[in-house]
């Protein structure tokens, strides 16, 4: 049921319409060769943490340049914490392949979602993925808006969220970029695909 709602919420309810939309706009405003930091100027993310950790750090945010500068990063975005495909397939694909990603020289694997850092923290702990993956909240969606990866999932009772996507970024430059046709899809954004692209 949730998958059907997500698919319906994606662009007039038609997967074909969603595919045509992606094709006509080149997937997103960024792609291979783009500088991810320049594409989202002034944007910072909030690292997943408990409320007490937030207080202790004055609710600090992390600028994108600090996340990507001088590093090889695999980053993936998803519609939301505690949702079906995200919990059952997307995050586990990266958690289960972390050693293979590190063996390819990846410095960090990052999950970003339009959520607050506290919900992400609880979710990451529930998935036992915090040791393998860094989780960041894009609480107001500004990062995903800047990349043209925002989607309205109000029909699935989620509001404005992120499309499901992944990228390999080397020192801020996008080397590989994958976006699913619908947020409920899980065909091109998993770790198995990005491993072949590094």
Swiss-Prot record:
First-tier enzyme category under EC: oxidoreductase
Membrane spanning residue stretches: none
Catalytic activity entry: [glutaredoxin]-dithiol + a hydroperoxide = [glutaredoxin]-disulfide + an alcohol + H2O
Name recorded for this polypeptide: Peroxiredoxin-2F, mitochondrial
Family affiliation: Belongs to the peroxiredoxin family. Prx5 subfamily.
One GO CC term, this protein: mitochondrion
InterPro entries: PRX5-like (IPR037944), Redoxin (IPR013740), Thioredoxin-like_sf (IPR036249), Thioredoxin_domain (IPR013766)
Pfam families (UniProt xref): Redoxin (PF08534)
Quaternary state and interactors: Monomer.
Role noted for this protein: Thiol-specific peroxidase that catalyzes the reduction of hydrogen peroxide and organic hydroperoxides to water and alcohols, respectively. Plays a role in cell protection against oxidative stress by detoxifying peroxides. Reduces preferentially hydrogen peroxide rather than alkyl peroxides. May be involved in mitochondrial redox homeostasis.
Organism: Oryza sativa subsp. japonica (Rice)
Transit peptide feature range: 1-27
Domain Thioredoxin: 34-198
Xref: SUPFAM superfamilies: Thioredoxin-like
Keyword check for Transferase: no
E.C. code: 1.11.1.25
One Gene Ontology term of the molecular function aspect: thioredoxin peroxidase activity
Active-site residues, Swiss-Prot/TrEMBL: 86 (cysteine sulfenic acid (-soh) intermediate)
CDD domains: PRX5_like (cd03013)
Keyword Amino-acid biosynthesis applies: no
Keyword set, alphabetical order: Antioxidant, Mitochondrion, Oxidoreductase, Peroxidase, Redox-active center, Transit peptide
Localization annotation: Mitochondrion matrix
Gene Ontology biological process terms in this record: cell redox homeostasis; cellular response to oxidative stress; hydrogen peroxide catabolic process
Further facts: The active site is a conserved redox-active cysteine residue, the peroxidatic cysteine (C(P)), which makes the nucleophilic attack on the peroxide substrate. The peroxide oxidizes the C(P)-SH to cysteine sulfenic acid (C(P)-SOH), which then reacts with another cysteine residue, the resolving cysteine (C(R)), to form a disulfide bridge. The disulfide is subsequently reduced by an appropriate electron donor to complete the catalytic cycle. In this 1-Cys peroxiredoxin, no C(R) is present and C(P) instead forms a disulfide with a cysteine from another protein or with a small thiol molecule.
């Amino acid at each position: 049921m949730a998958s059907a709602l997500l698919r319906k919420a994606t662009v007039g309810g038609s997967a074909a319409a969603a595919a045509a939309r992606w094709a006509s706009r080149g997937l997103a405003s960024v792609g291979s060769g783009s500088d991810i930091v320049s594409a989202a100027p002034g944007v910072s993310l909030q690292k997943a943490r408990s409320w007490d950790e937030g207080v202790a750090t004055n609710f600090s945010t992390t600028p994108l340049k600090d996340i990507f500068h001088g590093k090889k990063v695999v980053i993936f975005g998803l519609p939301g914490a505690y949702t079906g495909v995200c919990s059952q397939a997307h995050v586990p694909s990266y958690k289960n392949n972390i050693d293979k990603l590190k063996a390819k020289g990846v410095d960090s694997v990052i999950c970003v979602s339009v959520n607050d850092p506290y919900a992400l923290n609880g979710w990451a702990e529930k998935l036992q993925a915090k040791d393998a993956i860094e989780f960041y909240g894009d609480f107001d969606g500004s990062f995903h808006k800047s990349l043209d990866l925002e989607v309205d999932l109000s029909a699935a009772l989620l509001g404005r969220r992120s499309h499901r996507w992944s990228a390999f970024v080397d020192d801020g430059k996008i080397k590989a970029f994958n976006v699913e046709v619908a947020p409920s899809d899980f065909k091109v954004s998993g770790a198995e695909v990005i491993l072949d692209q590094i």
